[in-house]
Amino acid sequence: QRTKFYTDLWHVLLGRHKIDDVNGEYPDLTDGQRAGSFTRDIRVKTRTLPRDAAGRVVHHMYNSDAFWLTQWNLNVLWGLGWPEMPDEMSASLIRYADNGGLIPRGPCAGGYTYIMSGCPATPLIVSAYNKGLMRKCDPMHAFRTMQRNHMPGGMQGIGEFYLEHGYQPKNAGMTIESNFQDWALAQMAVRLGLEDKAAYFGNRSHGWRKLYPVSYTHLRAHET
């Protein structure tokens, strides 16, 4: 049991790799055209991470598996076992957005993959802030970046229909996902004292109720 336990702990650290070199340079592949789950016509850049007063990079840049559903496991475990990792990863994800506009779902080689759906990085970043672990990026800047990604054109992948009705047509699962991410963002807004944003995203998180008619015992997707 001890061997299995520590092997499983090791497993949760796999799938993430630093991509910045010893001199702080890293590849930026965020400038391109989305083609399904991939990016084409990429204009590759080399960027350099800022350093602190001691000459160390302020954080590292990472590749990672997609963060889809990690709010149920990895986000919690990292905060307990490796509290520096939610901070590191949050700073890295926000810098991806500073470079390319979008917060990646699963950053790859310094760029985007568009694997899975929604904006699964939001619960991770909010968790880092609400646990008092966010040290390497500005919380307000992180919030504004996530807010932009929760609007049409952002990584969350919603449209005007969702803004008006609160749910994703023909998809109860994606409705719950978007609602949960909106709820998470609302919690950070509360802590930051942004009452209007907390109310806005809090209200958006209630859209799932429209898919739960009293005559049913489960959520039912609306066709329109």
Question: Which residues does each predicted region cover?
Answer:
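Extracytoplasmic, non-cytosolic globular domains
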Residues: 182-213
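Secretory-pathway/luminal and periplasmic proteins that interact with or process carbohydrate-rich
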Residues: 14-20, 98-104, 209-216
